């Protein structure tokens, strides 16, 4: 139980680091839209649309770069001599590390879905992210519950990963469709 709570703290750390990236991303997106609407010539809206798409993918790249840095940081916390084993005098079992990695990937997908949702909310499309989060929660709870009860408790993280994946896919699709229709 103690090891599980430490690993959960690592996953929360990943998510909190990514939340800062989300805050930066939506602030720069809003600023871009405000400035872009003022300076874009009405005869060349495709230039604005292309810049908007480019900025979105730059924000996704920033999210992944931050995620990679967070994973490296957590890897050192787990494996460095001054890290987990040095502080708690216990070694982490492979299962705990596996659950942590799967959970971390799930949190990255969740953060990407949240970035997509922030874009959609900013653009006035509120229903699509709400539907996506409802579907994701249903998948997370049902799949996580079934796997954890009938196979092993650690498989509940697979439900979270799948739910986050569905959330990301649905919100990404909504963003791409919006960008295509600009």
Predicted features along the sequence, with ranges:
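A membrane-interface helix-boundary motif in multi-pass transporters
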Residues: 1, 150-161
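Membrane-interface segments at the starts/ends of alpha-helical transmembrane spans
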Residues: 1-11, 88-95
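Specific pore-lining/lateral-gate transmembrane helices of multi-pass inner-membrane transport
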Residues: 5-83
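Transmembrane helix-loop junctions in multipass membrane proteins, especially transporters and channels
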Residues: 23-27, 31, 75-87, 123, ...
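Short alpha-helical transmembrane segments in multi-pass integral membrane proteins
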Residues: 58-73, 156-178
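Interfacial segments at transmembrane-helix termini and the short loops linking adjacent helices
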Residues: 71-103, 108
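Alpha-helical transmembrane segments
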Residues: 86-92, 112-128, 176-182
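Short runs within selected transmembrane alpha-helices of multi-pass transporters and secretion channels
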Residues: 98-123, 129-144, 156-172
